[in-house]
């Protein structure tokens, strides 16, 4: 045996026996199984574990039960199966020493060729399936140019007439105009939509592919029909794509593009041609929808009901963000029962107070009164007019003959009828919108009443305050004037004349700068060559010494001026004030005392003045020394 198996290249001679020695031969899993007689069977495990079912009656697979069944198949086998296998082995005994080969033997090269053929066959099938799902590629000829254009093969669940109006108006030439855009249902669309209203989406979408199913899955599948399981999975989260034929679903979604078509009414042929040349074959935003435009012969009419139309460019337009999965994605979703995008936006948008007041849901709710109700109202009006006659309506058209035949009519109103009408109106059920409006009206009414009460209360408070103010007004007028005067004086006093930033400038409030005046006074006392004439500021202020308002400044001792104080400013005006004060003091003393007393007083005054002058000279000398 060792000689029959050639040594493989690159293998050590010491390990050559691995390929021929039976000790190293791998045992089959089949030989490890334990043989069981007829007393034991797989059905015992199935009976032991009862399968649970979901709300649709389908069995729920339990991982533990499946594991036990798999272990049973792995480690046990029946006697009958073993006997059958032994018979088969006995019949098919192959003498490998003579070069015989079993019937089911397949070489590696054959495996590769067979796998290639299978894969090529599968690819051919897939390519055929993909070729089946296509849009209408063979576009007819454009034909003669006309004023009107037809737009086909768009996602009409999201595209509205106002979207087309906004898009095409960008390509209108000067002098042209789009009169209106209308969307009509096609014959194919009407037939399909009528069928879907009764049956729903086509049942072909939910058929299972049982070609490649394994035997295990066939055993675990229930007896439910493919149609029922598909519809159930459609409403289960995460199971919608399991039993849906993706190819049929894609074809259905592409067919929905042909349910409607739009007609663009242009003012002239130049406008329609410009739109056709610029838009045909282009993509609408990033939705994967390509504009497919066709010329419509002039004079062609459309009798179908208009789904929606647009004749004026809408204000505050916002395009819808969407994409058609059937045109660009591998996974396609069923949009048959999808909520319209407009309704979702209306539900999510926050309404203003005005929009709540004028809430209009006509597009989604049926109106309370139809045309038949209007006809009934007209008939009731005509009947009442016939009962009342010409009384109060055609009095100007009466003729003398009519006066002879005139008959008085008595009209009585019974309160019972009015009460009945009230009861009938009360018996009517209130809709949700009416309930919202009623509550909003009550809320607004309560808010207005509250605001009104607050206004009345504030007016009362104002009146009471005004009364109290009027009483105190006479007493407070004098205080207000005093406060104003003191405020003005404080503003002048609080002005900072020593501010470094404002030095050299005139104070706008006081109309002078005291620092500049003092510097100029010092410069005047210097000798001519040391003077800085450009810094000399002329003090043009002349105090009114005869003003009676400043009488106390010159006569009262409380306003005495001490030149030795550091706050003293030796200006021309201040010197005049000092002279005037001393003059008036002297005159006062002369009037009060005799001539002798006056002489002594004058001498004393002169001495005092002399002392003051000496003190000032000493201070000035000391200050000069310090500066040097």
Swiss-Prot record:
<dbReference type="Pfam" id="PF08159">
    <property type="entry name" value="NUC153"/>
</dbReference>
<dbReference type="InterPro" id="IPR039754">
    <property type="entry name" value="Esf1"/>
</dbReference>
<keyword id="KW-0694">RNA-binding</keyword>
<feature type="region of interest" description="Disordered">
    <location>
        <begin position="192"/>
        <end position="229"/>
    </location>
</feature>
<feature type="modified residue" description="Phosphoserine">
    <location>
        <position position="223"/>
    </location>
</feature>
<feature type="compositionally biased region" description="Basic residues">
    <location>
        <begin position="615"/>
        <end position="628"/>
    </location>
</feature>
<feature type="region of interest" description="Disordered">
    <location>
        <begin position="412"/>
        <end position="541"/>
    </location>
</feature>
<feature type="compositionally biased region" description="Acidic residues">
    <location>
        <begin position="492"/>
        <end position="501"/>
    </location>
</feature>
<feature type="compositionally biased region" description="Acidic residues">
    <location>
        <begin position="119"/>
        <end position="135"/>
    </location>
</feature>
<keyword id="KW-0539">Nucleus</keyword>
<feature type="modified residue" description="Phosphoserine">
    <location>
        <position position="369"/>
    </location>
</feature>
<feature type="region of interest" description="Disordered">
    <location>
        <begin position="78"/>
        <end position="147"/>
    </location>
</feature>
<feature type="compositionally biased region" description="Basic and acidic residues">
    <location>
        <begin position="481"/>
        <end position="490"/>
    </location>
</feature>
<protein>
    <recommendedName>
        <fullName>Pre-rRNA-processing protein ESF1</fullName>
    </recommendedName>
</protein>
<feature type="compositionally biased region" description="Basic residues">
    <location>
        <begin position="208"/>
        <end position="218"/>
    </location>
</feature>
<comment type="function">
    <text>Involved in the 18S rRNA synthesis. Required for the early cleavages at sites A0, A1 and A2.</text>
</comment>
<feature type="modified residue" description="Phosphoserine">
    <location>
        <position position="372"/>
    </location>
</feature>
<dbReference type="InterPro" id="IPR056750">
    <property type="entry name" value="RRM_ESF1"/>
</dbReference>
<feature type="modified residue" description="Phosphoserine">
    <location>
        <position position="225"/>
    </location>
</feature>
<feature type="region of interest" description="Disordered">
    <location>
        <begin position="582"/>
        <end position="628"/>
    </location>
</feature>
<feature type="modified residue" description="Phosphoserine">
    <location>
        <position position="86"/>
    </location>
</feature>
<dbReference type="Pfam" id="PF25121">
    <property type="entry name" value="RRM_ESF1"/>
</dbReference>
<keyword id="KW-0698">rRNA processing</keyword>
<feature type="compositionally biased region" description="Basic and acidic residues">
    <location>
        <begin position="420"/>
        <end position="439"/>
    </location>
</feature>
<feature type="compositionally biased region" description="Basic and acidic residues">
    <location>
        <begin position="451"/>
        <end position="462"/>
    </location>
</feature>
<dbReference type="GO" id="GO:0032040">
    <property type="term" value="C:small-subunit processome"/>
</dbReference>
<feature type="compositionally biased region" description="Basic and acidic residues">
    <location>
        <begin position="192"/>
        <end position="207"/>
    </location>
</feature>
<feature type="modified residue" description="Phosphoserine">
    <location>
        <position position="367"/>
    </location>
</feature>
<feature type="modified residue" description="Phosphothreonine">
    <location>
        <position position="220"/>
    </location>
</feature>
<dbReference type="GO" id="GO:0005730">
    <property type="term" value="C:nucleolus"/>
</dbReference>
<feature type="compositionally biased region" description="Basic residues">
    <location>
        <begin position="440"/>
        <end position="450"/>
    </location>
</feature>
<comment type="similarity">
    <text>Belongs to the ESF1 family.</text>
</comment>
<dbReference type="GO" id="GO:0003723">
    <property type="term" value="F:RNA binding"/>
</dbReference>
<dbReference type="InterPro" id="IPR012580">
    <property type="entry name" value="NUC153"/>
</dbReference>
<feature type="compositionally biased region" description="Basic residues">
    <location>
        <begin position="582"/>
        <end position="592"/>
    </location>
</feature>
<dbReference type="GO" id="GO:0005634">
    <property type="term" value="C:nucleus"/>
</dbReference>
<feature type="compositionally biased region" description="Low complexity">
    <location>
        <begin position="104"/>
        <end position="118"/>
    </location>
</feature>
<keyword id="KW-0597">Phosphoprotein</keyword>
<keyword id="KW-0690">Ribosome biogenesis</keyword>
<keyword id="KW-0175">Coiled coil</keyword>
<feature type="modified residue" description="Phosphothreonine">
    <location>
        <position position="542"/>
    </location>
</feature>
<dbReference type="GO" id="GO:0006364">
    <property type="term" value="P:rRNA processing"/>
</dbReference>
């Amino acid at each position: 045996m060792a000689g029959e198996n050639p040594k493989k290249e690159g293998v050590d001679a010491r390990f050559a026996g691995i390929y021929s020695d039976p000790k190293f031969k791998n045992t089959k899993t089949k030989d490890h199984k334990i043989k069981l007689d007829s007393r034991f069977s797989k059905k015992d495990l199935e009976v032991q574990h009862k399968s649970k079912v979901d709300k649709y009656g389908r069995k729920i697979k339990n991982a533990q039960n499946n594991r036990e069944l798999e272990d049973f198949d792995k480690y046990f086998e029946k006697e009958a199966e073993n006997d059958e296998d032994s018979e088969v082995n006995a019949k098919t005994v192959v003498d490998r020493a003579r070069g015989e080969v079993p019937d089911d033997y397949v070489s590696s090269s054959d495996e590769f060729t067979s796998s290639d053929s299978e894969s090529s066959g599968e690819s051919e099938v897939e390519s055929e399936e993909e070729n089946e799902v296509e849009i209408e590629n063979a576009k007819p000829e454009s034909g003669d140019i006309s004023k009107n254009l037809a737009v086909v093969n768009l996602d009409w669940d999201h595209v509205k007439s106002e979207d087309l109006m906004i898009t095409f108006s960008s390509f209108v030439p000067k002098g042209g105009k789009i009169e209106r855009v209308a969307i009509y249902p096609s014959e194919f669309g009407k037939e399909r939509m009528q069928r879907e209203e009764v049956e729903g989406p086509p049942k072909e979408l939910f058929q299972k592919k049982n070609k490649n199913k394994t035997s295990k899955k066939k055993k675990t599948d229930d007896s439910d029909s493919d149609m029922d399981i598909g519809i159930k999975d459609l409403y289960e989260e995460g199971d919608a794509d399991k039993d849906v034929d993706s190819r049929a679903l894609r074809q259905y979604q592409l067919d929905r593009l042909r349910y409607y078509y739009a007609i663009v009414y242009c003012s002239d042929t130049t406008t329609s041609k410009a739109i056709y040349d610029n838009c045909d074959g282009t993509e609408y935003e990033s939705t994967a929808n390509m504009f497919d435009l066709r010329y419509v012969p002039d004079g062609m009419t459309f009798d179908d009901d208009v789904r929606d139309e647009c004749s004026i460019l809408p204000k505050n337009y916002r395009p819808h963000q969407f994409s058609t999965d059937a045109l660009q994605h591998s996974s396609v979703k069923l949009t048959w029962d999808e909520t319209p995008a407009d309704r979702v936006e209306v539900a999510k948008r926050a309404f203003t107070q005005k929009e709540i007041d004028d809430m209009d849901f006509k597009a989604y709710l049926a109106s309370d009164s139809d045309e038949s109700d209007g006809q009934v109202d007209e008939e009731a009006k005509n009947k009442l007019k016939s009962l009342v006659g010409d009384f109060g309506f055609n009095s100007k058209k009466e003729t003398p003959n009519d006066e002879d035949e005139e008959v008085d009519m008595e009209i009585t109103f019974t309160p019972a009828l009015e009460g009945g009408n009230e009861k009938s109106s009360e018996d009517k059920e209130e809709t949700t919108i009416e309930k919202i409006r009623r509550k909003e009206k009550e809320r607004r009414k309560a808010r207005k009443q509250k605001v009104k009460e607050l206004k009345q209360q504030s007016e009362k408070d104002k009146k009471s305050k005004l009364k109290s103010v009027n009483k105190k007004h006479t007493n407070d007028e004098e205080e207000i004037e005093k406060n104003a005067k003191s405020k003005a004086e404080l503003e002048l006093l609080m002005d900072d004349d020593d501010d470094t930033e404002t030095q050299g400038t005139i104070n706008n409030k006081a109309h002078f700068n005291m620092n500049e005046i003092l510097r100029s006074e010092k410069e005047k006392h210097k000798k001519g060559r040391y003077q800085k004439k450009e810094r000399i500021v002329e003090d043009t202020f002349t105090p009114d010494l005869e003003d009676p308002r400043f009488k106390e400044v010159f006569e009262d001792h409380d306003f005495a001026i001490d030149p030795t104080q550091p706050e003293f400013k030796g200006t021309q005006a201040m010197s005049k004030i000092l002279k005037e004060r001393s003059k008036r003091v002297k005159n006062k003393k002369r009037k009060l005392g005799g001539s002798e007393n006056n002489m002594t007083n004058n001498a004393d005054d002169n001495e005092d003045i002399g002392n003051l002058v000496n003190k000032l000279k000493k201070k000035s000398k000391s200050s000069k020394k310090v500066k040097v």
